[in-house]
């Protein structure tokens, strides 16, 4: 058996003559892999193989390399630990500073590279599809200059027409104002800023101006001026002292006395003339109808006569210039209290009833003007005779609880004389609105209100009616309640007997008092139908019209007449 234990520190197996470098490998081989010696013949004839010699040589070389690596590592470690702790710390600090400087230099190089790439991308792509920015800016500046020149020319033309209109005599101005021109009058004093803007708009239109942008801008200024005037009037009302309350009360009483005097003068003239209002003097019958009081004289503005006008749909309808109760700073202490007695009350068919249209709230912010169209319906069927109330300007939302949106002050009253009571009679209100400068009103919403209960009593009260979307078809009451509401728009009105008109005329109209109005009671369709058969026999024909009423119907354009449906 060959013995290799003395060569290079190798360990040989006693059973198979294999050599190993460590005792662990030899033990593992002996325990698991050793198969013993070869046969004696082979053992005697064989010599150590070339493979074994080559493996021994390779293992010796590897061992020498490992020893050299261990020696160099030990030397390096000895050199590093040879110095003092301070020296080692300085070496580490220097190494750290050197590495940080290298890192910063690399970061700056990367940033410069990124900026260079961005510049190349901008130069390749270019702004707005490849057009260079200077040319783009030049084109925008040129367009802005052209638009400014057009606006300047329009303003100069408008100023020239306005100066020419001021130089003309008053008679010529009246002649120009008599030309048919459909515009919506503002209910403000001529001295206000809104009235001046309205005059400016008239001058622009009479001069031939039809630019929609200019008209829209003037209309926006008019709305802002109206809102500013309303805010100023509210501020003045809040600043009234106790000393001025008596003066305002005396002024209101004087206006009442003046209205009564005018009413007596009218009655005197009618009694002297056998043909009624057709023989009235010219200054009372034709041109100055605004000086005459309404049938029930209001305390502040006076009701003008009903005039025939062409509505915005092309059909002729009666426009009632209702009483516009702009309060002149009266204190609530001297007015009708908010909790006035209103509720179901006996009804006098001869006298009729009166409807006060106070205001609208929750309107869409895109609406500029609104108009209310009213009519009567029996059992859901329209009886004809639609009437248009005066248009109202949309104002900003008041700072008070209520529906969100703009508001509009209607301030109109509508007498309904000689109406037979019936639980099937209802009031139908249609809301129309103007958008922008198109001047074509569009129907937006509608509402209905029953006028009598099952006991044929008039449903007096302050009512708030939710305005519902179209279509306004002949539906039952239950079906009407299922129609969705048009946003948050609501109509606020008062329904009273004709004998209560004087007291209700003194009530203040303020959109901030929306909480004083209630929703009408819900009435089922079955109860209404049963009450119709119960009370149908009790209906009586209205009395025949008197001679004065006949004359008023014949000449309704010459004097005041009740609001007809």
Curated annotation (Swiss-Prot):
Residues 58-87 are annotated as: Disordered. It comes from the Eukaryota. Keywords: Coiled coil. The keyword Coiled coil applies. The keyword Ribosomal protein does not apply. Residues 97-160, 219-271 form a coiled coil. InterPro entries: CCDC17 (IPR038800). This is Coiled-coil domain-containing protein 17. It comes from Mus musculus (Mouse). The gene is Ccdc17.
């Amino acid at each position: 058996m060959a013995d290799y234990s003395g060569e290079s520190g190798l360990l040989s197996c006693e059973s198979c003559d294999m050599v190993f470098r460590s005792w662990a490998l030899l033990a593992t081989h002996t325990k698991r892999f050793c198969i013993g010696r070869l046969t004696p013949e082979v053992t005697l004839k064989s010599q150590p193989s070339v493979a074994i010699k080559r493996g021994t040589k390779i293992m010796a070389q590897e061992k020498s390399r490992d020893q050299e690596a261990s020696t160099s590592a030990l030397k390096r470690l000895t050199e590093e630990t040879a110095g003092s702790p301070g020296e080692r710390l300085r070496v580490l600090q220097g190494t750290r500073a050197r590495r940080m400087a290298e890192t910063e230099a690399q970061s700056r190089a990367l940033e410069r590279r990124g900026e260079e790439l961005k510049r190349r991308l901008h130069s390749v792509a270019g702004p707005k599809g490849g057009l260079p920015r200077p040319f783009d800016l030049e084109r925008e500046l040129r367009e802005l200059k052209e638009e400014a020149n057009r606006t300047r020319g329009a303003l100069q033309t408008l100023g020239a027409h306005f100066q020419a209109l001021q130089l003309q005599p008053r008679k010529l101005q009246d002649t120009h104002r008599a030309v048919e021109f459909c515009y919506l009058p503002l209910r403000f004093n001529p001295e206000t800023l809104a009235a001046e803007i309205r005059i400016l708009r008239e001058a622009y239109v009479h001069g031939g101006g039809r630019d929609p942008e200019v008209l829209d801008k003037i209309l926006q200024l008019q709305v802002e001026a109206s809102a500013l005037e309303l805010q100023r009037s509210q501020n003045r009302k809040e600043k009234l002292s106790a000393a001025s309350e008596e003066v305002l009360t005396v002024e209101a009483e004087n206006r009442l006395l003046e209205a009564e005097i005018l009413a007596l003068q009218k009655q005197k003239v009618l009694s002297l003339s056998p043909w009624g209002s057709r023989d009235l003097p010219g200054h009372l019958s034709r041109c100055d109808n605004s000086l005459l009081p309404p049938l029930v004289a209001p305390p502040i503005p006076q009701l003008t006569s009903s005039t025939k006008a062409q509505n915005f749909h092309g059909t002729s309808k009666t426009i009632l210039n209702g009483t516009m109760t702009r309060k002149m700073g009266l204190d609530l202490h001297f007015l009708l209290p908010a909790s006035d007695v209103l509720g179901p009350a006996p009804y006098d068919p001869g006298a009729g009833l009166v409807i006060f249209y106070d205001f609208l709230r929750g309107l869409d912010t895109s609406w500029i003007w609104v108009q209310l169209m009213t009519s009567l319906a029996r059992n859901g069927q329209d009886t004809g005779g639609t009437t248009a109330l005066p248009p109202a300007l949309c104002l900003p939302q008041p700072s008070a609880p209520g529906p969100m949106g703009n508001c509009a002050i209607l301030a109109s009253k509508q007498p309904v004389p000689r109406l037979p009571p019936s639980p099937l009679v209802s009031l139908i209100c249609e809301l129309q609105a103007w958008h922008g400068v198109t001047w074509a009103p569009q129907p937006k919403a509608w509402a209905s209100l029953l006028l009598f209960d099952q006991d044929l009593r008039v449903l007096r009260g302050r009512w708030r009616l939710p305005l519902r979307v179209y279509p306004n078809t002949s539906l039952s009451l239950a079906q009407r309640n299922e129609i969705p509401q048009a946003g948050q728009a609501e109509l606020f009105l008062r329904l009273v007997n004709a004998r209560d008109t004087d007291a209700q005329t003194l009530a203040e109209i303020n959109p901030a008092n929306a909480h004083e109005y209630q929703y009408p009671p819900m009435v089922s369709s079955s109860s209404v139908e049963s009450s119709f058969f119960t009370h149908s026999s009790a209906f009586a024909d209205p009395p025949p019209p008197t001679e004065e009423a006949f004359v008023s119907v014949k000449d309704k354009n010459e004097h005041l007449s009740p609001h007809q449906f």
